[in-house]
Each structure stands twice: as structure tokens, then as C-alpha cells.
Amino acid sequence: MKVLLLCWRDSTHPQGGGSERYLERVGEYLAEQGHEVVYRTAKHTDAPRRSRRNGVRYERAGGKFSVYLAAPLSIWRNRPDVVVDTQNGIPFFARLFTRRPVVLLTHHCHKEQWPVAGPVIGRLGWFLESKVAPRVYRGARYVTVSEASRSDLVALGVREGDIEIVENGVDPVPAHVPSLYDDHRTHLLTLSRLVPHKRIEEAIDAAARIPGAVLDVVGSGWWEDELRAYAQGRGDVVFHGHVSEPYKHALLERADVHLLPSRKEGWGIAVIEAAQHGVPTVAYASAGGVADSIRDGETGRLVQDGDDFAEATRETLERRASMAENAKRWAQRFSWEETGRRFAAVLAELVTPR
């Protein structure tokens, strides 16, 4: 089976994140099973136009918007047996350019995020996502990562029976994780791309209200300068930027509570990464998928809109010991192998051998 994966970025892109990691892990699993996998994405300065990694062939062309225009040519050249069209706000509309099966991968809907793009692009983007895409993909197979995201799709008119939930996996903790100096302080941590809809400002505010707490901000993004300015005079905040996997896990191992004040999450891979170390997460229930990745009161706290995020953080710190083992057991349920197996089963149902 030849599989074409369409996504606007890959994990080597400076703005790559959990959505890209998900698709790459699925592609790697398919390649391990003997399938031919092509990952088509945008070009960027840190990567060649063509490369191969872990059995997956990467093809890069186009930029932030023109990557969508390059997709039809990629479909024609590769002639895949099945296409996975990743909808990060808007899809590639691959179904218009091939008669082969197309699976639409949607991590979450972007209604709350489109306003950041400005009034014109925001309204156009939401129109394409909420009105046009459901019509083009009517009757197609959807894959999403949580019950919350499935509910959002159903609200847009997608039939519930067309939607398969394939949850995120998680990478194993590296065999060698460095030990960090124990300064005997309370360490709060946020692990995220630094963009407006992640609302890192609320994590900064929460940490500032807890005496002696340090907030470790792990991740990078174009909003970083704004966050650094906001953090001035608001407690002890350390910006680590993009870090290696071992160092990321060292920071998680030292953390007491993980803060995820994001406006919208399809699942929240960082929730499970923190749970691997027995670190509970505080997040907003309204963010969507975190209501599935966090077991409220057991592996973390789900805060309702209007509630005090800092107070929930303080309460979670007091209950951290009882939540730690629950979080570790919960994290053991998730693996990329299981994610890949379930996604492969969806594709197998659609592809008829030639």
C-alpha cells in the first residue's frame, strides 16, 4: 500500500508541534509494516526538499499558504492508494483531486484560534473549516484524537459514524535523563509552542501567586518576545527555549505541576509526557481534548472558565503525592505503536488491493 500524508509542517519545522509528531509516528509505523509512505509538507530553511527518516520519504514544497497549492501535483505524481489529509484549520481538499480513498485527520476545530489571524483571514478560515470542508468530505472517513474533538466535528455536520477516534501515543522516557540540581523550590512547568492561543500568560500569573515558585517555560515560538516582556516583574520565570528530549524529560522529572492554560487542544501530548513522571496537569476543561487526556481529580485538574487557575494549581500542589502514581499508571496506557496500529486498521478498511 502506498500512503501519501499531507501536512502543512513536519517536526523539523521551527513551528512544528504535536500534530506533526502524530502524523510522523503513524507514518513510521506504516513504513515498519512494509508500506510505502510519502510525507508531503512545506519547505523551510532547516531541511532539504527531499529526505528520508525512519522509513518515511519527505517531500517539501511551498510555504505557509502555497503548500496547499502544491498538494494536487504531489497526488498526481505519487499516485497513492490512500491519502491522509491533515486539517490544521483547513484541509488540503485532497478529495477533489483523486478518486482514491482520503482520510481527513483533524486534531481539533479552530474556531477559537482563527481570530488571531485577523478579521478577514479569520472569517475566511473558519468558513472553509466549518462550512466548505464538511461538504467536500461528506461521507469520507475522519480520524480525530478525542471525544471532545469528535463532538466538535459532529456539531459541524459530520456524521458521528464517519469519525474514528485514534488517540495520541507518547514516546518512551529516554534511557539516560540528566539529573538537575535540586534547589528545593516549587517548580511549575509549561511545555508548549509559544503562540497566543496557548495562553502562557495565565501560567505566568498562576506561578507569580504561589510564594517561592519557579515557572519553567519549555518550548519556542514567535510569541516568545511578548511573553518575556509580560513576565518582567511577575515572579521567577525561566525560558528554556527548544530543548533536547533528554533535557525536556529532566525538566519534567523535576517539575511539581504541569500547567496547560491553552485555549484549545485536540488531546495534549504534553499532558501524558508529564504524567510519565508522575506530574499532574492543570488545564481548562473548555480546551476540549484535555478533558479526555486528564482524569479530573486523579491525574490532574480541569478548571472551568472563570475559576481561579492559580488556586487550582495550589490545590494540585497539595495533592501531588496522591496524584503522582495515578498519573504514571494512566501514561502507561498510551504508545505510538498502538496509535499506528489503530490508524493502519482505518486505512486497511478503505483500500481495496489493485
Predicted regions and their residues:
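Membrane-proximal helix-turn-helix segments that form the acceptor-binding/catalytic region
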Residues: 121-142
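Nucleotide-activated donor-binding/catalytic signature segment of Leloir-type glycosyltransferases, i.e.
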Residues: 225-246
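Conserved donor-binding/catalytic core segment of Leloir-type glycosyltransferases
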Residues: 143, 177-210, 216
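Short hydrophobic beta-strand element within catalytic cores of glycosyltransferases
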Residues: 280-284
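Conserved acidic donor-binding segment of nucleotide-sugar-dependent glycosyltransferases
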Residues: 285, 295-307, 314-319
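Aromatic "clamp/platform" in nucleotide-sugar-dependent glycosyltransferases that forms part
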Residues: 263
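A short, well-ordered alpha-helix in the C-terminal region of glycosyltransferases
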Residues: 321-334
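Carbohydrate-associated surface elements
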Residues: 148, 169
